[in-house]
Amino acid sequence: MELKPYFHKCVKTIAAIMVALPAQAVDATPPDDYSGKPLRPVSAAYTLEAGSSQLVNTYLTPLRYNGIEAAFRYERMQAMRFNPEKWVMRLTASIKIDRTENPAKNAEMWRANAEATWGMTHRWKLPYNITLAAGGSVGANIGAIYNQRNGNNPVAVEAALTLNITGYATWKTHIGRLPLTLRYQPTVPLTGIFFSPNYGELFYEIYLGNDNGLIHGAWWGNYFRIENLLTADLHLGATALRIGMAQDLMSTKVNNITTELVSWRAIVGISGEWLSIKPGKGLDKNARIISALY
């Protein structure tokens, strides 16, 4: 489970993509009228993530499994059209894969999960190029955990729909002459619904119609999760190199089943701000540009 070769490949891939990107990127959003409306560039990022993972699911096994987690994340942020100075939209989509082993290292447990969130935050611009924002989002995720040791119950299904509280803090600064944007963003589900079978219940029984007690209301007593995201964008020109760290803590307890996930991932990727420009028309030198991050 050595991560060093994986990161070497990631860094080479990111470097190749950054070299291939044109100096002016074009986004698919409808063009703005430069004569009056402020310009709202799309801040987008594509990142690869990898790190450690601890996984418990007592539907499959009482043991704690340890291993690695890898992820791909897409993030899109843009100032809202109705009040771009104060409101910002954020869309994320990610895929995560975990490969873990039991304490004896003679059995593996795999986890695959896909997640998407959309939300809005209200922001406040402070002195010294600091921006604070707070708001909410809606998130949906679905996945499965597979344990090769189990015969009748080898798979546990995960699914949740949540309303979250979120926010961020950014600081626009420099390292020498290199522009740098630092950001910290936590996300915590507040309420929602999630899926869990009964302890020992076979999915074949659910298929036959035994579907009572599968959907549960989520609150911090039975479903707690927090994702902490810390990123640094090194602006190298038209695009930026994004590095950072992500932490994901999740715990669910329902139907005598406990699920726990603790993961730490290093982040490397590319980010940038994109504007749509009408063909044959350049950027108005007097246009007001409102960034989503600062």
Q: What are these language model-derived features?
A:
Residues 185, 195-197, 219, 223-294:
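Predominantly the C-terminal beta-signal and adjacent terminal strand-loop region
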Residues 38-46, 83-91, 128-136, 176-184, ...:
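Outer-envelope beta-barrel architecture signal
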Residues 152-238:
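Outer-membrane beta-barrel transmembrane domain signature
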